[in-house]
């Protein structure tokens, strides 16, 4: 794979931040050292320091390759690459895929929802969630569903939209959650009451 990071300078900052949601995802799901590196170097990344951009892209590609090599047909561990996407895809669909919200922005919000759900499930995240939220907010990434999208949905509609996700099995929504920072898992058993609580928090 060849990546010319100098091309990133041709993109508006909004698109850079949309892509960054996918980059930090790799730190959250499987590589805590990479996650900490991203947190420590946020200012250099957002000023497009070439050395740091190369490092970020390299580790993202490397981590994805590790997962895909283990599960080429997405039957098991590859599902963790979808952290934030089950919620994010629902947000995009409710917004009719309009350009007012990019895919990366929807994933960014979805990651926040997945972190909250992980915490409610009792996983070891409470003290770390605010650190990630602060990082997102400092970079001006999306962490809340915009009001114009909130007005289009309800708990019932949001869950019905989530049911179209590819991870749904036998009409049951499977979620990608975190046990701790750097360790994700496919959750097919969880409290639906807690899921409702997370959705309501973001749509109200």
Give each language-model segment a name.
Residues 1-43:
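A glycine/threonine-rich phosphate-anchoring loop and its flanking beta-alpha core
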Residues 2, 82, 176-178:
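Short beta-strand segments
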Residues 8-10, 88-89, 183-184:
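Short, acidic Gly/Pro/Ser/Thr-rich loop/turn segments
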Residues 21, 123-204:
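C-terminal charged capping/lid subdomain of soluble metabolic enzymes
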Residues 21-26, 58, 113, 160:
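Generic alpha-helical structural context detector
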Residues 25, 29, 47, 120-123, ...:
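Residues in soluble alpha-helical coiled-coils and helical-bundle/repeat scaffolds
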Residues 36, 41-156:
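Active-site segments that bind and position negatively charged phosphate/pyrophosphate groups
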């Amino acid at each position: 794979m060849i990546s010319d990071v100098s091309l990133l300078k041709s993109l508006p900052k909004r698109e850079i931040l949309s892509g960054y949601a996918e980059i930090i995802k790799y730190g959250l799901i499987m590589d805590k050292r990479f996650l900490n590196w991203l947190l420590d170097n946020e200012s250099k990344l957002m000023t497009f320091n070439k050395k740091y951009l190369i490092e970020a892209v390299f580790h993202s590609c490397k981590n994805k390759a590790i997962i895909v090599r283990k599960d080429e047909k997405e039957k098991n561990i590859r599902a963790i690459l979808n952290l934030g996407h089950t919620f994010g895809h629902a947000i995009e669909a409710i917004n009719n895929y309009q350009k007012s919200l990019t895919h990366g922005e929807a994933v960014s919000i979805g990651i926040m929802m997945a972190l909250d759900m992980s915490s409610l499930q009792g996983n070891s995240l409470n003290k770390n969630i605010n650190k990630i939220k602060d990082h997102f907010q400092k970079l001006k990434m999306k962490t809340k569903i915009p009001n114009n999208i909130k007005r289009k949905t309800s708990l019932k509609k949001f869950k019905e939209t989530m049911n179209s996700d590819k991870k749904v099995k036998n009409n049951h929504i499977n979620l990608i959650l975190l046990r701790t920072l750097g360790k994700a898992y496919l959750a097919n058993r969880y409290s639906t009451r807690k899921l409702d609580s997370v959705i309501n928090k973001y749509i109200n």
